[in-house]
Amino acid sequence: MAKEKFSRNKPHVNIGTIGHVDHGKTTLTAAISAVLSRRGLAELKDYDNIDNAPEEKERGITIATSHIEYETENRHYAHVDCPGHADYVKNMITGAAQMDGAILVVSAADGPMPQTREHILLSRQVGVPYIVVFMNKADMVDDAELLELVEMEIRELLSEYDFPGDDTPIISGSALQALEEAKAGNDGEWSAKIMDLMAAVDSYIPTPVRATDKDFLMPIEDVFSISGRGTVVTGRIEKGIVKVGDTIEIVGIRDTQTTTVTGVEMFRKEMDQGEAGDNVGVLLRGTKKEDVERGMVLCKPKSITPHTKFEGEVYILTKEEGGRHTPFFNNYRPQFYVRTTDVTGSITLPEGTEMVMPGDNLKITVELINPVALEDGTRFAIREGGRTVGSGVVSKIIA
């Protein structure tokens, strides 16, 4: 049976859920899908379906990013449910990079928690431009004053990280109650709150101006081998357009390779082309699965080149933000997360700078052990021992 063609009749926006573990991110994702499915705007995905990677079952926490799609009257959304647990912040960095806006889930019963702060900070770092807040578990809070207090705390926290806290839409509700209502076939007050949330997302998160006219670039997230068809790489197209038949390069980590695109798919539907913002699978002619890995990029030939040495403008987190407690010195060797990969690199401090304190903002020179596709403006996170200690942006390529 031929695959159904993907229709592009509404503006497309990438969003996702972020927030502290157990505040209800996955339940909210399921509730949105359930409430919208009653209006014919989504396929119903239940909680277990969204929370479905094998590792999660043992620990009861979400690890992999789950993608679901749904529509409102105005838009088509691709929604990622981001991992919440601190151990999996690494995935959050690659997941959050896929969002035009985020729904921050905060339990009204608990208020903002350490990971709430960390996810707001990460959103700032990886360039999530807009946040809408869902104050979950409001059914567990009887005191209206307490709700107001939590709302104030959330607004202050957003403002602290340069998000417009005072203007951010905050909708309170209960994802679990809405999910139960929708499953029972009812449209009650809790489902109405989900519709309020989607209305806020529709109006507050602008339709992104897609970088479709720039040169094609797609960071590789995953690589699959499909028997009889070849190698498929998946990821979100960062900019430009890719068409079936295009000649493209695979850049980073190893020597640059050239290949031809033989297929483009989105949500299991075939397309003639993929464009900036789309989460796609790209079929590559004659490329072996072992020649490609996460962290490489697909790009228009000669448009971006692999580099190992650059200058970057960085901010080093304070210990309160979850960063280092102590300074670091010249030749410090952390991991650099660029797009979808981590590469070890050494930091050279500017002349006259002996050490860097948590909270400092400075220009550094970085030398990576493996080449990565880089250009001015490429963002990266600095991590060590499983936690983010800094964030930065490439200001100048050296080699």
Curated annotation (Swiss-Prot):
* Example GO molecular function: GTP binding
- Region annotation (G3) maps to 81-84
The family note in this entry says:
Belongs to the TRAFAC class translation factor GTPase superfamily. Classic translation factor GTPase family. EF-Tu/EF-1A subfamily.
Q: Binding of GTP: at which residues?
A: 19-26, 81-85, 136-139
Region feature (G1):
19-26
Which InterPro entries does the record match to this protein? EF-Tu_GTP-bd (IPR041709), EF-Tu_GTPase (IPR050055), EFTu-like_2 (IPR004161), EFTU_2 (IPR033720), G_TR_CS (IPR031157), P-loop_NTPase (IPR027417), Small_GTP-bd (IPR005225), T_Tr_GTP-bd_dom (IPR000795)
The subunit structure is: Monomer.
**Protein keywords:** Cytoplasm, Elongation factor, GTP-binding, Hydrolase, Magnesium, Metal-binding, Nucleotide-binding, Protein biosynthesis
Catalytic reactions on record? GTP + H2O = GDP + phosphate + H(+)
Q: Which HAMAP family match?
A: EF_Tu_B
Q: Which residues bind Mg(2+)?
A: 26
Residue numbers spanned by region G4: 136-139
What's the superkingdom here? Answer: Bacteria
Q: Has keyword Magnesium?
A: yes
PROSITE patterns in the record, alphabetically?
G_TR_1, G_TR_2
Annotated EC: 3.6.5.3
Its job: GTP hydrolase that promotes the GTP-dependent binding of aminoacyl-tRNA to the A-site of ribosomes during protein biosynthesis.
Locate the region G2: 60-64
Main localization, broad class: cytoplasm
Please give the residue ranges the record annotates as the region G5.
174-176
Under which main EC class is this enzyme filed? hydrolase
Query: Any idea what this protein is called?
Result: Elongation factor Tu
What is its subcellular localisation? Cytoplasm
Q: What is the lineage of its organism?
A: Bacteria, Pseudomonadati, Campylobacterota, Epsilonproteobacteria, Campylobacterales
